């Protein structure tokens, strides 16, 4: 009796290890979160003559699934319900009618970790390949976007910056690009895996951060890259010197030098004119003073018949007249002296007064 009970078990085990049913698949695969992977797979099964015209359906199940109750994660059977969390992300790309059971996984998520097995059904022929199974490992997303800057950044000149994720999958959900920058920017054209930012930097933007952030919405993960802007600033109107060259320098530099030279020459000429004018005024004033002194001396003629008293009085007033030329004596006394002298003297001034006149002229 115990032997009769063992016979069905042995028969089931023989079906499970039936050499007519075999499968080749990569036993372990690793994929980064948010990315995709394609797992090649091939299987074989015997085809009874009565099932030759039956369609072939393939299914991928999680390890431990109960076929009659649990839904597969992927299948080529159109009316078959699949697991909600894997719908649209797990796909049976291979054609089971051609013995192809290849599986595609896109927008990989952490909860996709685990083992999976394949099952085929063709008419009355149905078989689950429990060995080997596929083991899926989902790791952190370590890839980062790449930022391309063509040429150098100059203040006031627009440049197109490109952020790309060439390592992303074509079949997955298109990533979402975001830019963060303090400089004036605007969005340019974009493709599935790249975005263009039009930036017009300013001098104060040198050394500031620019970030390109990429979100993979299908997996809920984000990656980014940050760079520092290198804005090359060259002064537009330098006037500190003239540098030799081939004549191809900027007009602004030459104009600045010419304007500086003209301004310097103008200032120099103005100073020279002021000095000449001052010198002319002083010289003219002194000449007038000298002529006035000579005229006053001529209005005091002396005669031989003049009394000694008158001569003495005239000599006493001589220094007063000389002082009056320099503005030291009062004008009233000067007029009185001139009136008195004109009535009493008819001769030339003494030689002493003449020498005094030339002594004053030499002081000019």
Curated annotation (Swiss-Prot):
Residues 283-364 are cytoplasmic. Changing residue 100 to A: Significant loss of binding to peripheral blood granulocytes. One of its GO terms (biological process) is signal transduction. Monocytic/myeloid lineage cells. In the brain, CD33 is mainly expressed on microglial cells. Changing residue 340 to A: Abolishes binding to PTPN6 and PTPN11. Increases binding of red blood cells. Residues 1-17 form the signal peptide. Glycans are attached at residues 100, 113, 160, 209, 230. A motif (ITIM motif 2) lies at residues 356-361. N-acetylneuraminate binds at residue 119. Belongs to the immunoglobulin superfamily. SIGLEC (sialic acid binding Ig-like lectin) family. Sialic-acid-binding immunoglobulin-like lectin (Siglec) that plays a role in mediating cell-cell interactions and in maintaining immune cells in a resting state. Preferentially recognizes and binds alpha-2,3- and more avidly alpha-2,6-linked sialic acid-bearing glycans. Upon engagement of ligands such as C1q or syalylated glycoproteins, two immunoreceptor tyrosine-based inhibitory motifs (ITIMs) located in CD33 cytoplasmic tail are phosphorylated by Src-like kinases such as LCK. This is Myeloid cell surface antigen CD33. The gene is CD33.
